C-alpha cells in the first residue's frame, strides 16, 4: 500500500533472489478502508518508495491512480464467504472484500508466477491463499516472516502515527506475542491459558486498548480451544492511543514433530502455499 519499510523491502529482496523480474505494487487501495478509517491520512511517499524498491532489486513499481483501478460506476467485487468474519474482519467488515478485489485485479494485470506477502498480515495471507485456490489463479503465494525493529515492534507504516510515549507503549504487543509463543513452544496446548497470559501483558499497559486477541486454525480462520494437529495463528489487534496495530505468531505442530515430507516448510504440507 505504499510508504514502504524494511518489512516490505525483505519481500522484494527475497522475490528478486527467486525470480527473473520483480514488480512491486505501490497503491493505497481505497476499497479496503472503512468510512471512519485512515485512507486520507495514510502515509505516502512515492519517491522514497521507488528508491527502496530499486535498492531491493525491483524491476518495476506499479503505481496506478485510483481512477485507473476503479471506474466511476464500478460495481464488481471479489467477496469471500469464509475466513473474513473473524479477527480483523469483525471490526473491518468491508476490508477483505477490498483486499480480494484489488489483489485479483493486480494478478490479472501483472500475471505473476509468484506473489509475496508478509506474515504480519496473517489473515490476509490466509485469505489470498484461499482466493487463489478457489479462483484457479496459477500463482504461488509465498508467505514471508515478520520483520521487527530491534526492540521487537513489528514494522508497520502506521508506526509513524505513534508519539514517543505511544511508541514505547506499543512494545506490549511484541511482548505478548513472544510470551504466548514461548508458552506454546514449551508445550502449552490450551488456547485460553495462552490468550489470558497475552491479554494480561497488554492490559497492563495504560495506553493499550485490545480490539482482539484470538487463536484460530490458520488455514480456515476458525477459533480453536486447543492446539492439536493443524497450524494455528495467534493474532491480535490493539489500539495504542488512536493507532490500531496488529501482531501475531504462527505455530505449526508438524514442524515441532519434524515434518517428513522434505518440503522444507515451503510446500502445501507445511505452510499452505
Positions of PLM-derived features:
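Phosphate/ribose-recognition catalytic cores of enzymes acting on nucleotide-derived substrates
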Residues: 197-273
Amino acid at each position: 500500500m505504499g510508504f514502504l519499510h524494511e518489512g516490505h523491502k525483505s519481500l522484494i529482496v527475497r522475490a528478486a533472489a527467486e525470480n527473473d523480474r520483480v514488480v512491486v505494487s505501490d497503491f493505497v487501495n481505497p476499497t479496503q478502508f472503512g468510512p471512519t478509517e485512515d485512507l486520507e491520512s495514510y502515509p505516502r511517499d512515492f519517491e522514497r518508495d521507488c528508491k527502496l524498491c530499486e535498492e531491493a532489486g525491483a524491476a518495476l513499481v506499479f503505481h496506478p491512480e485510483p481512477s485507473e483501478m476503479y471506474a466511476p460506476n464500478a460495481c464488481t467485487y471479489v467477496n469471500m464467504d469464509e475466513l473474513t468474519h473473524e479477527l480483523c474482519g469483525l471490526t473491518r467488515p468491508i476490508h477483505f472484500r477490498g483486499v480480494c478485489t484489488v489483489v485479483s485485479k493486480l494478478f490479472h494485470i501483472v500475471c505473476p508466477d509468484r506473489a509475496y506477502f508478509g506474515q504480519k498480515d496473517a489473515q490476509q495471507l490466509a485469505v489470498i491463499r484461499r482466493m487463489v485456490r478457489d479462483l484457479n489463479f496459477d500463482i504461488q503465494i509465498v508467505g514471508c516472516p515478520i520483520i521487527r525493529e530491534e526492540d521487537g515492534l513489528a514494522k508497520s507504516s502506521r508506526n509513524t502515527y505513534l508519539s514517543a510515549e505511544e511508541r514505547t507503549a506499543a512494545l506490549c504487543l511484541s511482548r505478548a506475542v513472544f510470551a504466548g509463543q514461548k508458552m506454546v513452544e514449551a508445550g502449552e496446548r490450551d488456547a485460553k491459558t495462552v490468550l489470558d497470559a497475552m491479554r494480561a501483558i497488554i492490559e497492563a499497559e495504560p495506553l493499550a486498548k485490545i480490539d482482539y486477541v484470538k487463536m484460530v486454525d490458520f488455514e480456515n480462520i476458525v477459533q480453536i480451544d486447543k492446539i492439536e494437529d493443524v497450524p494455528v495463528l495467534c493474532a491480535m489487534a490493539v489500539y495504542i492511543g488512536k493507532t490500531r496495530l496488529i501482531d501475531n505468531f504462527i505455530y505449526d505442530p508438524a514442524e515441532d514433530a519434524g515434518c517428513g515430507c522434505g518440503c522444507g516448510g515451503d510446500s502445501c504440507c507445511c505452510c499452505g502455499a
